Amino acid sequence: MRGNVPQLKDVVLHLTPQTEIDLQCYEQFDSSEEEDEVDNMRDQLPERRAGQATCYRIEAPCCRCSSVVQLAVESSGDTLRVVQQMLMGELSLVCPCCANN
């Protein structure tokens, strides 16, 4: 395009149809036992997570300067919810800079 006003003859569109994409899955398992193992592992995963401690990173603002304070904790999901409720309530975090002052 040259000039201040674009003209229709300056606009060139090249439309080409996309080639067809084969969406068929050709994956094959050796036996149905492998499928059963995968299903069993997927079913057991939430059960293990319920009682097992997991690492979490908590980010919250400093109550004095509003900078981000990061905590790394290891707990179960239920205990983490208690910490969340405490942080939403009256418990506040203080960054290291504000804690020294």
From Swiss-Prot:
GO terms for cellular component: host cell cytoplasm; host cell nucleus. It comes from the Viruses. One of its GO terms (molecular function) is protein domain specific binding. One of its GO terms (biological process) is symbiont-mediated suppression of host type I interferon-mediated signaling pathway. A motif (Nuclear export signal) lies at residues 80-88. Signal peptide: none annotated. Highly phosphorylated. It is found in: Host cytoplasm; Host nucleus. A zinc finger (unnamed) spans 62-98. Belongs to the papillomaviridae E7 protein family. Plays a role in viral genome replication by driving entry of quiescent cells into the cell cycle. Stimulation of progression from G1 to S phase allows the virus to efficiently use the cellular DNA replicating machinery to achieve viral genome replication. E7 protein has both transforming and trans-activating activities. Induces the disassembly of the E2F1 transcription factor from RB1, with subsequent transcriptional activation of E2F1-regulated S-phase genes. Interferes with host histone deacetylation mediated by HDAC1 and HDAC2, leading to transcription activation. This is Protein E7. It comes from Human papillomavirus 51. The lineage of its organism: Viruses, Monodnaviria, Shotokuvirae, Cossaviricota, Papovaviricetes.
